[in-house]
Amino acid sequence: MASKKPENMSFESTIEELEQLVEQLESGDLALDEALRKFERGISLARAGQLKLDDAEQRVRILLSNSDDAPLSDFSDVAE
């Protein structure tokens, strides 16, 4: 079964598969070729996940900037 392209996966599915790949790579039980293939897949997943996060952050900033009454602040400054 062919793997889905990372850009076509949900963020949650991307992270789930990435976690599975990390576990497999950390086990040390893979042949070099298999480990390299999984590493390459992991890099693709990590990049796609980062793009999804960047897109979500940009969308939040746009939504907040459309509200004239709401000042923009960093996520870390939000009170818990």
From Swiss-Prot:
Catalytic function, reaction form? Exonucleolytic cleavage in either 5'- to 3'- or 3'- to 5'-direction to yield nucleoside 5'-phosphates
Q: Which UniProt keywords apply?
A: Cytoplasm, Exonuclease, Hydrolase, Nuclease
Q: Which SUPFAM superfamilies match?
A: XseB-like
Statement: the UniProt record of this protein carries the keyword Cytoplasm: yes
User: Could you mention a single GO BP entry for this protein?
Assistant: DNA catabolic process
What highest taxon heads this organism's lineage?
Bacteria
| Cellular component, GO annotation | cytosol; exodeoxyribonuclease VII complex
InterPro entries reported in the protein's UniProt record: Exonuc_VII_S (IPR003761), Exonuc_VII_ssu_sf (IPR037004)
Q: Output one GO MF annotation.
A: exodeoxyribonuclease VII activity
Q: What is its EC number?
A: 3.1.11.6
**Which EC main class describes this enzyme?**
hydrolase
Q: Which family does it belong to?
A: Belongs to the XseB family.
- Which NCBIfam families does this one have? PRK00977.1-1 (NF002137), PRK00977.1-4 (NF002140), xseB (TIGR01280)
| Self-association and partners | Heterooligomer composed of large and small subunits.
Q: What does this protein do?
A: Bidirectionally degrades single-stranded DNA into large acid-insoluble oligonucleotides, which are then degraded further into small acid-soluble oligonucleotides.
Q: What is this protein called?
A: Exodeoxyribonuclease 7 small subunit
Q: Name its species.
A: Vibrio cholerae serotype O1 (strain ATCC 39315 / El Tor Inaba N16961)
